[in-house]
Amino acid sequence: MRVLVLNGSPTGEDSITLFTVKYIEKKFPNVTFETLHVGQRIRQYERDFAEAGEKLAAADLILFAYPVYTFLVPAQLHRFVELMKGSGMDLSGKFATQITTSKHFYDVTAHRFIEDNCGDMGLRCLRGLSADMEDLRTEQGRREAEAFFRFVLWQMEHGYAEPSPWGTTAPFLPVVPAPAEAAPAERKPGTVVIVTDRDEDGEDALGAMIERFRVKLPYETRVVNLRTFPFAGGCLGCFHCAADGTCVHKDGFDRYLRENIQTGAAIVYAYTIRDHAMGYRFKLYDDRQFCNGHRTVTMGKPVGYLVDGPLSREPNLQMLMEARSQVGGNYLAGIATDEAAPEREIDQLAETLAYAVENDYQQPKNFFGVGGLKIFRDLIYQMQGLMRADHKFYKAHGFYDDFPQKHRGRIGAMYLVGALMKNKKLQKKMGGRMTEGVTLPYRKVLEDADKR
């Protein structure tokens, strides 16, 4: 059996994920493995896809191996998926699976991205392995990697695969331009940045959405089109920026980001759905923001989305947008699409975003935000010697304050309550008054509110 490994890491042979693949290769000597370093050599495959096409055609199993970069695959692998789908070659019926290494920060959205695109190509997708970066160094991690691939072979032998979720696509509605008189008589101070990757040649649905939003928003807007920025390449995972936030690429993106985008009072992302995501350029933009490390430098600023395409059929993309705003500490003012009622949704987004900016409106984090930041908190605390700027930022903003071992008073109180609850006589005497005791601090809040 022939396995083609698509190594999506820009570090090539030095990829931690690839070491897991090599370990599996040693454990299954009767299986032939071949690796394409698509992350490191993406420019080569952009120029000539023929070699990759031949390797893909000859493979029985296509194995995507990559580190998770900002919720998804590295931008270089995202681009290779585009090339696969654009090549026109027939891969239907072949098996595909994936191996990732990360600290489990939104590995689920990365895996779903690959699964969805495999479904588009008619590949029979098998559930992948999501490993911690340190797993291969442990006996359990090595055992899990070997068991994973043995299970993959069993599934292939029996012809099993994950079901494809796709059905039909609903038609989209053209956006009606807002008349000039619909614009506010006077703009409020502050600028909202609209980041897009649209092709500005000719009229398109996304352009109409952006224009209506700009008319209805009571703030000045600045459009930043990623197509016009001369990206030298994607994030290389080299950690050159860990010390002072300066990227190893000399294209000036780090300065451009901080001066032209992060200075806005709010940020709106406008895109057309491509390959179940925001498109390759937006992934390039996301990955290159690692010049900010794990620092949520725009927290407190609201965000919004203008989406051209069938968002209702993209649950993974919906989760990604909400999770990104939650982790970043940005209030998600809304997502307007051109599926059902585009004018109403765009107008509502404009008004809601304006309210959030004017009133500095923020909400507490949900599971996406709390869970994601706890992973980052633990990671940065362990790696503070390398990621010094991140560590300094986390200390200054109280990200370490919720370490459970710091709340010794609460821990001691729970021990006391637990000991009291063991006393049967006391428990019987208290009856249902336990909940009354729990609510005492909350009752005091209401009493204090009455006094004010």
Regions picked out by a protein language model, each given a short descriptive name:
Residues D120-G167, V327-Y361:
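A charged, well-structured terminal subsegment
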Residues T109-A110, Q140, A205-L206, Y280, ...:
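A short secondary-structure junction signal
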Residues E13, R43-Y45, Y106, D135, ...:
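Generic structural signal for helix capping and beta-alpha/helix-loop junctions
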Residues M1-S87, E146-L153, S164-C291, D347-Y355, ...:
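N-terminal beta1-alpha1-beta2 submodule of the flavodoxin-like/Rossmannoid cofactor-binding fold
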Residues G86-M89, F105, D116-R124, W154, ...:
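Alpha-helix capping at helix-to-loop junctions
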Residues S87-S92, N292-G300:
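Short, conserved loop/helix-junction motifs that constitute active-site signature segments
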